[in-house]
């Protein structure tokens, strides 16, 4: 026959065990979105270069307030920008030259993507034709190593 104190101890033990499992379950559910550069393609025509960037996200949650920074080749101006993107200011002596483009991508759902296409003028002949892109969001990223890419064309 169980005494009242034994029943109380068993009830307390069961309550503690179920609470501990619930806490462990909450710890394994982490808010995260692996935002990444999926594609960076750069093409060249006679007078322009075009960079096509695809930003993708996965790992359960949406990437909130996603942003993309495009580092432009030296000595280029902007030919075409998509909505939501703005070029950094150029130097006072040659205001047409730009260093970077910043894009607000909004929220990207899990397994969703955003595509951005930017066209620039060609840099002077001896300058490298290299684009660098970096993406990030307000959601914690479990794998930040895939947030950057760069391409150089001839």
Question: Each predicted region: which residue ranges?
Answer:
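Bacterial N-terminal signal peptides that target proteins for export
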Residues: 1-9
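Bacterial N-terminal signal peptides
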Residues: 9-17
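Extracellular/luminal low-complexity Ser/Thr/Pro-rich, glycosylation-prone repeat/linker regions
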Residues: 25-34, 59, 87-88, 134-154
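Solvent-exposed, conformationally flexible loop/turn segments
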Residues: 40-48, 110-113
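Short beta-strand elements of extracellular/lumenal beta-sandwich folds
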Residues: 44-64
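Short solvent-exposed strand-capping/beta-turn motif centered on an Asx-Ser/Thr pair
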Residues: 56-62, 73-75, 123-125
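A surface/secretory-pathway sequence property marking extracellular, secreted
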Residues: 65-101, 106-107
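Low-complexity, intrinsically disordered segments enriched in Ser/Thr together with acidic residues
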Residues: 105-127
């Amino acid at each position: 026959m169980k005494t009242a104190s034994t029943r109380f101890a068993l009830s307390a033990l069961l309550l503690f065990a179920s609470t501990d499992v619930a806490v462990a379950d909450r710890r394994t559910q982490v808010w995260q979105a692996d935002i990444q550069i999926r594609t960076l393609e750069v093409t060249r025509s006679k007078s322009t270069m075009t960079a096509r960037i695809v930003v993708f996200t996965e790992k359960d949650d949406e990437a909130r307030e996603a942003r993309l920074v495009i580092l432009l080749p030296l000595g280029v101006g902007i030919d075409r920008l998509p909505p939501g993107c703005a070029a950094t200011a150029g130097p006072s002596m040659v205001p047409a030259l730009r260093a970077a483009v910043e894009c607000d991508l909004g929220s990207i759902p899990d397994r969703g993507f955003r595509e951005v296409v930017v066209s620039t003028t060609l840099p002077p002949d001896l300058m490298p034709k290299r684009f660098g892109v970096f993406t990030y969001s307000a959601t914690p990223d479990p794998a930040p190593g895939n947030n950057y890419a760069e391409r150089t064309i001839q």
